[in-house]
Amino acid sequence: LVELDVDALITGFKDLLLSLEQDRKLAGKFAGILHITNDSIADVVQSDRTELLYGQEYFYEELLGLKFKISTFSFFQTNSYSAEVLYQTARDYVGDLGGSDKTVFDLYSGTGTIAQLMAPAAGKVIGVEIVEEAVEAAKKNAAANGLDNCEFIAGDVLKVLDEVEEK
């Protein structure tokens, strides 16, 4: 099942967005259509207002056997096929870390994708991310994937590392 998510960062055109779901070739493939309003000058995706026009505010993506719930403002690789190659290469490079005495750190972890993909090779994985919503998503995704050796901490990486016991 291929799910599509349309996040339009525009100032109008809601009718056009809704017409996408009515297109016969695309009908039934959208997890959600959101209208994101941002009238400020910015080089990042930010929202002055987000309106759900259709469906839900998230979609699911599967990478290397793990399933991730992705929302509009989650950090997630946009090219999933390339991400799988990259992450598989990283897993192959790391290999088996020798069991329960090894800890992997995923710094600036976002929604914890890399941490979760490394979890089977390590005794423990610690992800650190400053965006609290991303940390909550990482915790939920890890639980949904049955990974009990992942810990995600919300905070500034430089400050959190001073406080972490596993170094």
Walk through the language-model features, giving the residues of each.
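Accessory RNA-recognition modules of RNA-modification enzymes
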Residues: 1-167
